[in-house]
From Swiss-Prot:
Cofactor(s) annotated in UniProt: Mn(2+)
Enzyme Commission identifier(s): 3.4.11.9
Annotated source species: Ajellomyces capsulatus (strain G186AR / H82 / ATCC MYA-2454 / RMSCC 2432)
PROSITE patterns (UniProt xref): PROLINE_PEPTIDASE
UniProt binding sites for Mn(2+) 2: 283, 294, 469
Name under which the protein is recorded: Probable Xaa-Pro aminopeptidase HCBG_01484
Amino acid sequence: MGPPLAQELTQACNQPLAATSNLQPDDGYKIELRAENTVDKYPAKQHARRVAAQIRQGKGLIFLMGQKSTLHEDSDQERSLRQRRYFFYLSGVDEADCDLTYDIKTDKLTLYVPDFDLRRAIWMGPTLERKAALQKFDVDEVNYHSSLDEDVKKWAKNQDPGSTIYLLHGSQGPAENPPNVIIDSKALKLAMDACRVIKDEHEIQLIRRANDISAAAHLEILRGITSMSNESHIEGSFLNTCVSLGAHNQAYQIIAASGSNAATLHYSKNNEPLKGRQFVCLDAGAEWNCYASDVTRTFPITHQWPSIEAKQIYQLVQEMQESCIALVKEGVRYLDLHFLAHNILIKGFLTLGIFKGGTLDEVKKSGASLLFFPHGLGHHIGLEVHDVSPQSIMAQGINDDSNNKLILPTCVSPCTTSSPALTSGMVITIEPGIYFSQLALDNAKPEQLKYIDMARVKNYMAVGGVRIEDDILVTKTGHENLTKVPKGDDMLEIIRQGKKGNDSHHV
C-alpha cells in the first residue's frame, strides 16, 4: 500500500473518539480510534424544523414514541434496546421509555423521560433525570412521562378545532385522542423520509466514525486470517475489535461466508471450517450512535490468489465497483450505475467464456447476468443500514425497456416507487457481486441457459461468491468514499504481513 492512502486512512481514523486503540502500525495502516464521543449535541431541533417544513403546515403537534422496555417472550430477561429510528431522528435519545412532542407553531421540542423508579434504579441504574437530559439533548423542555397525556390535552384545548396531531403510526399516539383534533398517521413518515435521505454534517460524521471502526475491524481480520480456521473466528474477531473501540452494536448481522456459503447473499451461520476453501466474503459493519456502516470485503485465507479463476472473478467485481464509484456525483441516476455494473459483468463473462453465443445486448435481455448478480447495486445508508427514502434510488424509468430483465424486487427494497437523481448529502452503498449459486443455476430459464457455457461455469463454482462494498457520500462536485479498507493487491499485502509487533487493543 502506498503512502497516500495510508496517510488518508490514518487521518480519517485519528478524529477524536477517545480511549485509543493502536492497531498494527507496521503495515502502513495505523489506526487510532478513541471511544469517547466528542461531537456536539445531536441536532434534534434542526431535524424537527426540517420535518415541519416538509409537512408544509404552520401548526400542529408531532407526537413520537420511543422504544419501550420489553421482555423476551416467556422470560424475565429484557430485550436489548434498539431505539426507534424515527424517534431518534427528532431526539438523539438512545434510551428506553421516552417520548417526544414538537409544537410546530411555537417551535417547541419536548422530551418525556421515565418517572423515577427506585426499584429499577437499584437494579439497573438510574434513568434520565430532567436536568441532565436537558443538558445532554437538543430539546427545549424535559418532562416526566406521567405528564405526557395531560400535556397533550392542554395543547389540544388551546388549538382551533381541526388542528392536527401527526403520528408515525396510528397505534403510536396519545392514550386518548383529544376530541377536537385530527389524527394524521401518513404525512409525518413521508416528511421524515424526505429529510432522512439527505444527511447533515453531524450525521455524516457519525457514519464516518462507524466506517472507521469497521475499517479497523476488517483490517484486524486481514492481519489475522491465516491463523483462523473457522468462520466463527472471523465473526468473533470483528465483534471484539468493534466492542473494544466502543461500538457495542452491529448495523446488521455479520456475514462471514467461506467457499460456497458466499453464494448465499445473507448467509449468517458463520460456523463452518475454512480449510480447503478459496475465499471468505465478510459483510460486516459497526453502528455508531445509531448510525450504520455497511462494508464488504472478499479475501483469500492465504496471502495469494487461491486460483486463476478466483483472481479473475475478484478483479471483475473490483472493476464493476470502481467504475461505478467513479461516476457517483449529484445529478447521476443511480439505476444507470446498476446497469453499468451488469454491462461490465457481461463483457467480462464473454471474455472468460462463461457467456457464449450472443452479443452484450442479447445476453442482457435474456437476464443471464441476474443468475450471477441477483441484487441491486446498493441502497441508502444512515439510521438504518437500508435507510429510508421517499423514492427509491433503484426504480425503473420510463425508457428502460432494454434493461427490464435487470430490475428485480430486491433492487428497490426497502424503498418505494420512482427514481430521482443522486443528491448531495445522500450516503449510498456501491456493492456489486458475482456469485456461483448452484441453486440459481438449477432454476435458470431456458433463455438464460442459452448463453451460458455450463462446462466453463464448473471451473468457477469453487470461487463461491465475491462482493465488494463501500459507503459513498454524494457531494456537489463528486463523491467521497467513507470506507477505508484495502482491496486487491493491497489487501493481499496486508494478509502477507500479518500481525507484527504488539497486536493488543489499548482501550
